[in-house]
């Protein structure tokens, strides 16, 4: 059974996608994708042999050994020249780790990135766009009192404003939840802030967020 956090990623995966799931979370979403006939097969990878072994146990319980190819290793490094992958799925990792994973020559073969992170979205958007991608979808997810943002990148070139890189594209789903969280966070910081310049800067960010919510 997969939780709402993982389930929120499924709609971004199409039947023609050839997927590697990096950091495979016990293969839960991968089993779901196969059993529900969304994908015919998938490669999963995890740098932790213990986590991967748990995934392999789940795969065997569901008799999907011939559909889910489990490999232990660091991100895209598990792929070889014979693998025909065009889509990367990454969830439950920090932005710096994600960017290290994407720093790989195999990325040239990738057309779609489905990424779920819980921090450093500005850095994530800015750096992935530099790699030749543009944002096609964004959605705010709250699961077990934690907030995540799903960002789907596809190949393409598009210019974004600094506000879009910081706070997301205009049609980001459930953005009000995220903006309200940030406004409350910034307002609490202002209560104890002594630096006038930083106070003004943060107040400006709050005003921007309030405008984005309209």
Which residues are covered by each model-predicted region?
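Glycine-rich SAM-binding Motif I of class I
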Residues: 27
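Conserved SAM-binding motif I beta-strand of class I
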Residues: 41-46
């Amino acid at each position: 059974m997969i939780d709402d956090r993982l389930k929120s990623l499924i709609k971004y995966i199409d039947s023609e996608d050839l997927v590697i799931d990096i950091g495979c979370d016990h293969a839960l979403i991968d089993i779901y994708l196969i059993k529900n006939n969304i994908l015919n097969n998938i490669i999963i990878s995890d740098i932790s042999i213990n986590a991967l072994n748990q995934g392999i146990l789940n795969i065997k319980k569901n008799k999907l050994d011939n559909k889910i190819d489990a490999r232990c290793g660091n991100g895209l490094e598990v792929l070889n020249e014979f693998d025909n992958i065009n889509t990367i799925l990454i969830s439950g990792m920090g932005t710096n780790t994600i960017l290290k994973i994407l720093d790989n020559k195999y990325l040239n073969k990738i057309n779609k990135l489905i990424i779920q992170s819980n921090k450093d979205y500005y850095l994530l958007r800015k750096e992935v766009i530099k790699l030749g991608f543009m944002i096609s979808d964004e959605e705010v997810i709250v699961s077990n009192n934690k907030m995540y943002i799903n960002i789907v990148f596809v190949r393409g070139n598009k210019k974004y404003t600094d506000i879009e890189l910081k706070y997301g594209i205009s049609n980001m789903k459930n953005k009000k939840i995220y903006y309200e969280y940030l406004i409350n966070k910034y307002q609490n910081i202002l209560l104890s802030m002594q630096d006038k310049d930083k106070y003004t800067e943060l107040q400006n960010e709050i005003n921007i967020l309030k405008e984005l919510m309209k």
